[in-house]
From Swiss-Prot:
<dbReference type="GO" id="GO:0003746">
    <property type="term" value="F:translation elongation factor activity"/>
</dbReference>
<dbReference type="InterPro" id="IPR027417">
    <property type="entry name" value="P-loop_NTPase"/>
</dbReference>
<dbReference type="InterPro" id="IPR000795">
    <property type="entry name" value="T_Tr_GTP-bd_dom"/>
</dbReference>
<dbReference type="Pfam" id="PF00679">
    <property type="entry name" value="EFG_C"/>
</dbReference>
<dbReference type="Pfam" id="PF06421">
    <property type="entry name" value="LepA_C"/>
</dbReference>
<dbReference type="Pfam" id="PF03144">
    <property type="entry name" value="GTP_EFTU_D2"/>
</dbReference>
<dbReference type="GO" id="GO:0005525">
    <property type="term" value="F:GTP binding"/>
</dbReference>
<dbReference type="InterPro" id="IPR038363">
    <property type="entry name" value="LepA_C_sf"/>
</dbReference>
<keyword id="KW-0378">Hydrolase</keyword>
<comment type="function">
    <text>Required for accurate and efficient protein synthesis under certain stress conditions. May act as a fidelity factor of the translation reaction, by catalyzing a one-codon backward translocation of tRNAs on improperly translocated ribosomes. Back-translocation proceeds from a post-translocation (POST) complex to a pre-translocation (PRE) complex, thus giving elongation factor G a second chance to translocate the tRNAs correctly. Binds to ribosomes in a GTP-dependent manner.</text>
</comment>
<feature type="domain" description="tr-type G">
    <location>
        <begin position="6"/>
        <end position="188"/>
    </location>
</feature>
<dbReference type="InterPro" id="IPR035654">
    <property type="entry name" value="LepA_IV"/>
</dbReference>
<dbReference type="InterPro" id="IPR006297">
    <property type="entry name" value="EF-4"/>
</dbReference>
<dbReference type="GO" id="GO:0045727">
    <property type="term" value="P:positive regulation of translation"/>
</dbReference>
<dbReference type="GO" id="GO:0043022">
    <property type="term" value="F:ribosome binding"/>
</dbReference>
<keyword id="KW-0472">Membrane</keyword>
<dbReference type="Pfam" id="PF00009">
    <property type="entry name" value="GTP_EFTU"/>
</dbReference>
Amino acid sequence: MSIDQSKIRNFCIIAHIDHGKSTLADRIIEKTGTLTSREMQAQVLDNMDLERERGITIKSQAVRIIYTAKDGEEYIFNLIDTPGHVDFNYEVSRSLAACDGAILVVDAAQGVEAQTLANVYLALDHDLDVFPVINKVDLPSARPDEVAQEIEDVIGIEAMDAPRISAKTGLNIEDVLEQIVKKIPAPTGDKDAPLKALIFDATYDSYKGVIIFCRLREGSVKVGDTIKMMATGASDVVTEVGYFGAGQFIPCDELSAGMVGYIAASIKNVRDTRVGDTVTLVDRPCDEALPGYKKVNPMVYCGLYPADSAKYPDLRDALEKLQVNDASLQFEPETSLALGFGFRCGFLGLLHLEIIQERLEREFDLDLVTTAPSVIYKIHKTSGEVIDLTNPSNMPDPSEIEYMEEPYVSAEIMVTSDYVGAIMKLCQERRGVYISMEYIEKTRALIKYDLPLNEIIYDFFDALKSRSRGYASFDYEMKDYERSELVKLDILINKEMVDALSFIVFKESAYERGRKMCEKLKGEIPRHLFEIPIQAAVGGKIIARETVKALRKDVLAKCYGGDISRKKKLLEKQKEGKKRMRQVGNVEIPQEAFMSVLKLDEE
C-alpha cells in the first residue's frame, strides 16, 4: 500500500487551556466521518478517565483521518491533539516534532493568553507553519475581529482571513479542513533511504510489550524487519506496524517516510525505549540520529511512599511503566524514618504530580502517601563543594553552609486592567521582582515578574485566579539560581522529628509558616490518650507550638462520694499512666497531615 507523500498532512492543534482544542479535534473527526455518530463522544481523543473528569488533555493523542477535499483529491491527515497546561509543555514539544504544521486555536471571547504565546513560540522553534483559527464565535461575548487584530499585533501572524468557527456547534469546520490542505506543507523524506524514525511517545501493552509511536522521516519499515534504538542500542524484530484509528490501533503492511504510526516489536524491557530516540534498521542503519527533544528537568520533587510497605516493588513497577508513557517523570529510591521505603520523584509541576499520583492509584491500584513537594536548591558549602538538594531532610548542618541559592522563574501574567493592582500585590507578597508591564490593548496588560519557584509551586495559581476573578492567565519558564536567605523548618510531633514534614522556607517567613503549620497539624492529628505537643523548630530553636489535648477516661465514675484521698489516688495513678504512655506511645499521623503543608496559605 503505497501512499503519495504529497497527500499527507501531519499537524497538531495548539491553544491555551480551555480554548477548545479537543472539541475542534472531535468536530474534525466527526465531519470527516472517521467515526460513526454512535461512536462519537465528547473529547474522543482524551481516552483516560482522568482527562474526561477534569476536562483537560494530559497525553498527546494521534489519529489518522481521511478527507476528500473540494478539489476532489483524497488527503490523509495525521492529527495530534496536545495538552495546554504549562506542566505538560514537554508533551506539546514532543508532538510538534512529529508534525509539519500547527493549527492555533484562539478563543473569540478571551483572546490571546499567556500559554497561547508560549505554545506558538514552541511551534515556531520547530519551524512549523502555524495558521490561526478563531473559536467560540457563537458566544454572546465573542469579539472575533478584535481577537484577529490581537493575534496579528501580539503574535505577529496573519489572522484577518482566519476561519471563524464554533467547534461546539460545528460552524465553518469545512473552512478549517480546506485550510489544512492549503497551508500545511506535505512531508518530505526519501522512502528508499535507510530507516530514520523519531519516537514521540510510547505505551505499554501487557500482550505486545512496549508499543512505540513514531514519525518516519526517511525509509520504511514492515513486519519482520529488525529495528534498533540508536540511544540504547537495543534491537528487536518488528511484529506489527500500523497507524492510529480513533481510539484503536489499525495494522497495515508497511510504514514509509512522512507517515505517523506505531511499531510493536515485543519489547519487554521498559528501559530500552526512550522518547526522543531514533529508530533505524539493524542491517541498514542511518548515519546519525535525529535531534531528539531537549531533556526536561523536573522542577518539583516529592516523596511517594506505599501506605503498605510490602507494596514497594509494585510501586517501582508502576513507576517504570508510567515512565515509558511519560518521559518527564524521574524517580529514585529513598527511605524515610516516618514512612519507610519509597521513591523521590521529580515532576514538572504540581498538576503533573497530582495526575501521576491519581494514575498510580487508579491504574495500578496503589495506596500512596505523598510528602510535601520541594524544589531543587543549590547549597554552597564552606569546603567549596556545591550540592543539589532535592530532599529537605538531607540538608547539611548550617555550620557547613556558606550560602544557598534557589531557582527563579520568569513569569508572564496576562490580566485585565481592573486587576493589575491585585496581581502586582500578590507577586510582591511572593517575593517577586518586578520586570516590566505593557498594555496589549486598552483593557489588558502583560506583566513580567521574576519569582522564586518555591513560592509558585504550592498555590500561586489558585491565588492568581481568585484575585483576578479568573481573568488572569499565567505562563513561566525557568530562569536561573539566585542567592537567598533560606532555613530548614523541622516539625516535631511528640518531641520526635518527622523527616517527611520538614521543608525549606525563606528566613523571614519561617515563624509565620511554622505557626500556621502547627495549627494545621493540630486539626489533622487525631486525639490520643495522651497529650501530643506539635512544635516547629529552626536549627534546634522551637519557634511555634500547639498541643493536641488528651482524651481522658473518667476514672472517678466508680466513686460515689467517699474520701477525697481515694479520688486523688486514682487521678495521680491516671497521670502516671499518661506520662508513661507519652514516652512509649506512637502517634498515628494521617496522610492529610503530610499534604496540609501545601494548603497553608488558603485560610
